[in-house]
């Protein structure tokens, strides 16, 4: 949204219409944030959006994730943590339960709202973020 609360581009991404203008504007804004936060040779770890149990919401979130992933791919110092893949079922769709990498047991990872992660899901996500940090430290010569 703009400062005056108006929408920069009037479109609902993922709704089936032409979202080219929306994607372009969102990419511009996401890229600017990435460049700002990742400046001065800093590594930015960007955590993606998980899918939702509502297919309409998921369609919109997928568009956002696609744009963010494309912008991250243009920037070697941006690491994208893919929550979509981590918290999806075998078919790539919404999953309430996923395999916990700590013990390989399938567990409930979602809050009751069908989107947010519960404590177990947050712990699994924290493992992925920690791994991204370790990988970056190793790339910088750290003994991790």
Report residues per predicted region.
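Alpha-helical cap/lid subdomain in secreted, periplasmic
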Residues: 1-119, 123, 127-141
């Amino acid at each position: 949204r703009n400062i005056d609360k108006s929408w920069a581009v009037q479109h609902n991404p993922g709704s089936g219409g032409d979202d080219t203008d929306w994607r372009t504007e969102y990419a511009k804004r996401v890229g600017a944030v990435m460049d700002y936060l990742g400046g001065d040779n800093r590594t930015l770890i960007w955590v993606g959006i998980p899918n939702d149990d509502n297919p309409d919401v998921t369609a919109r979130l997928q568009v956002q994730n696609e744009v963010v992933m494309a912008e991250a791919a243009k920037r070697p110092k941006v690491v994208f943590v893919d929550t979509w893949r981590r918290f999806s079922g075998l078919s790539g769709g919404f999953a309430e339960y996923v395999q916990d990498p700590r013990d390989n047991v399938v567990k409930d990872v979602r809050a009751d709202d069908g989107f947010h992660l519960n404590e177990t899901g947050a712990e699994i996500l924290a493992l992925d973020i920690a791994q991204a940090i370790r990988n970056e430290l190793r790339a910088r010569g750290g003994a991790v």
